[in-house]
Amino acid sequence: MKEAQEINESSKNRIIGLSLETRPDHITKSEIKSMRNLGCTKVQIGIQHTDNAVLEYNKRGETIEDSYKAIKLMKDAGLKIAVHMMPNLPGSNPEMDVQALKEVFQNPMLKPDHLKIYPCVVTPYSEL
């Protein structure tokens, strides 16, 4: 990313915003500082679901509480937040998915600036 930043700094047409994607459990104050130093204005994180049982069933390796913590850190740093949600995950159902999507905008610990929805399709031979 450092090389891309250096190219942008001397480019005729400059990037005015940088959006980075990561996992909620990888967000730290140090990581946010590095992102801001690169000119990051928005971070996209893959929450996927708000139900910890669904996250565990799908081997996400993170909890919704990790997302709450990450979003607070990023908002405190002035970053715009995009969350990725994934309906149709194994272990969920349509009612749970609707509740998860409602929670994204009703829970004060979430409330992102941007939402991306990626419906899950489990492929043959997947561990899921």
Protein language model regions, located:
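Conserved non-cysteine loop/helix-boundary elements of the Radical SAM core domain that shape
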Residues: 1-82, 86-124, 128
